[in-house]
Design a protein with these regions (language model features):
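N-terminal amphipathic alpha-helix/helix-capping segment at the start of soluble metabolic enzymes
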Residues: 2-19, 26-27
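Hydrophobic faces of well-ordered beta-strands that scaffold small-molecule active sites
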Residues: 11-16, 40-42, 63, 72-76, ...
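Active-site beta-loop-alpha junctions enriched in small/polar residues
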Residues: 16-20, 45-47, 77-81, 101-103, ...
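Conserved anion-binding
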Residues: 24, 69, 80-87, 93-180
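Conserved, mostly hydrophobic/aromatic
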Residues: 25, 32, 43, 88, ...
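A structural motif
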Residues: 34-39, 93, 140, 200
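Glycine-rich, proline-tolerant flexible connector loops at the mouths of alpha/beta enzymes
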Residues: 40-59, 148-156, 212-213
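C-terminal helical cap(s) of enzyme catalytic domains, especially alpha/beta-barrels
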Residues: 196, 210-226
Length: 226
């Protein structure tokens, strides 16, 4: 399989475009680059799996046309992600993560993402136990643990997810796997430190990043976490 990184896992910040300026997404993406960050997290919502609507493949394509060269960490919060992965891959996604909760063939969809030239990830909502993805972790490049209920930004961090994070981190150590372990929801410098201690290496931050007085310093603090 294609691994995103090797051990040890250096921390990565993936600012969420959902918290950017929706009237000028390209400018928000440039803000990420100017902070010295290489990843951009894109939340794609269909209004069915989660009660909100956000971006589509054309958003990714438009950002690429505008010259954005960031690594697109693409999170599909869709009831039928298998219908759209090709469109997102063609639009410029680098990594496509899908949720375990909807009913579809997860293994086939992950393999299809890989066949399209993208890295693949699996996502769990707060109410979904880690065991639900145990059979898939050897097939992915990233596991994303939601630390809020997905759908809207700005929610408070759920500390009860730290145990789940630790369990998924333990699996990769015990099984010799190299997937990245990402968290999304209520992430600021304090909660990122808690997640780092539990085994997280990839941090989605929206409001806390874009509203930071010094985004470069914010990003640097994340990248230097031990």
């Amino acid at each position: 399989m294609l691994h995103v990184c090797g051990m040890p896992y250096a921390p990565i910040l993936a600012p969420s475009l959902l918290a950017g300026d929706h009237a000028n997404l390209a400018a928000s993406a440039r803000t990420v680059s100017e902070a010295g960050v290489s990843w951009l997290h894109l939340d794609l919502m269909d209004g069915h799996f989660v009660p909100n609507l956000t971006f589509g493949p054309e958003t990714l394509a438009a950002l690429r046309r505008a010259g954005c060269q960031l690594f697109f960490d693409t999170h599909l919060m869709l009831s039928e992600p298998q219908r759209y992965i090709e469109a997102f891959a063609k639009a410029g996604a680098n990594l496509i993560s899908i949720h375990i909760e909807p009913t579809y063939d997860h293994e086939v969809t992950l393999a299809r993402i890989r066949a399209l030239g993208c890295q693949c990830g699996i996502v769990l909502n707060p109410g979904t136990p880690a065991e639900a993805i145990s059979h898939l972790v050897d097939q992915v490049d990233l596991v994303l643990v939601m630390t809020v209920q997905p759908g809207f930004g700005g929610q408070p961090f759920r500390r009860d997810m730290l145990t789940k994070i630790s369990q998924i981190d333990q699996w990769r150590r015990e099984r010799g796997l190299k997937y990245r372990l990402e968290v999304d929801g209520g992430i600021d410098l304090a909660t990122a430190a808690e997640c780092r201690a539990a085994g997280t290496d990839t941090f989605v931050a929206g409001t806390s990043f874009f509203k930071s007085a010094n985004r470069r310093e914010f990003a640097g603090t994340i990248s230097q976490m031990q």
